[in-house]
Amino acid sequence: MSRKRIRWTLRALRRLDEIGAYIEKDDPDAAARVVARIGTAVDALAEYPASGRPGRIKSTRELVLADIPYIIPYRISRDVEILTVMHAHQQWPQVL
C-alpha cells in the first residue's frame, strides 16, 4: 500500500490553531503537546488511512485520540483530507 498525502482543510487548520491558542492561555507546554499529538496522529493516517472508525457523517472516518479528548474527522480519496478537529464533547455538525 502506498502512502497517501495528507491534506488539511482551512477549517481544520483554523481549529487546530484555536485549540492551541485556547490551551496556551493556561499552559503553553500543554498546548504544544496537544497540537503535536494531533499532528502525529494525522501523520500516521498517511500510512494507515483506514485506521479511524467509520464516521457519523456519510463518507467520513473519525480518528479518535484516546489520550486526549479530540476526534479528527477525515475523508479518504486519493489523499487523506482532514476536515476539522473536534473536542470529544462538542456537538457535531450535520455536514463537514
Swiss-Prot record:
Keywords: Plasmid, Toxin-antitoxin system. The keyword Lyase does not apply. It holds the Pfam family ParE_toxin. InterPro entries: RelE/ParE_toxin, RelE/ParE_toxin_dom_sf, TA_system_RelE-like_toxin. It comes from the Bacteria. Belongs to the RelE toxin family. Toxic component of a type II toxin-antitoxin (TA) system. NCBIfam families: RelE_StbE. This is Putative toxin Y4kP. It comes from Sinorhizobium fredii (strain NBRC 101917 / NGR234).
